[in-house]
Amino acid sequence: TPTATTFKKIEWNTDVDTFHKSSRDNGTTFARVEDGQWDPKNPNVFYFVTTESNKDPIATAPNPATPDVTRDGGALWRLTFKDAQNPLLGANLEMLLNGGESIMMSKPDNITVTNNGVVVIQEDPGGNAHVARVIAYRISDGKLATLAKFDSQYFTATGSKYMTIDEESSGVIDVTSLLAKPGDTNTYLMLNAQIHVKGGVTKADPAVTGALTARRPDLRNMPSSSKKRIDIEAIE
């Protein structure tokens, strides 16, 4: 059911504490808003995913096929603005997927919306025994399907060519206009695969130690040991 939603202007060019207070006082809290995309056929419609659900029992119910693997199906949302060029006029917010659908989505991460009306969703299970997939949600009727899946021989601990259980795809875009030939009705997507395998780095380069975390004010309260790990493991 669409829910009427209002927007307020938040001053972003300020210090972190002021920004956080303003956001808390005027905003709505979601569990990890991760990525969003405008509908190319409707400039007033915006789709986005939340990677987690704040431990919602529906979204975190185990996949019957892999009952021992933890899961969070997050959610897919749609914002329909009265006028996207003037968001202060308001919008309607809808939850399209609640994470409990039979496809048993796990950690929806990045998305795109194709010209033929499909939301493409990439999973990032995050160091989890679930093998990551690329999922399609057809806007017209809500049908779900798996478009692609990582090869289990590389990404399950018992696989014959095991590398890691920390794999994801990211950055999906619709490149049909670049690749399709006249008369071709296929949809073409481009994405990358992120295989999180350490490259043998055991310590951070002194020249860049702290350079990453120092530029992330949201990490300033992180323990020093965690900051060191980020500096080391940023190279994969």
Functional labels for PLM-detected ranges:
Residues T1-E236:
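Sequence/structural signature of beta-propeller domains
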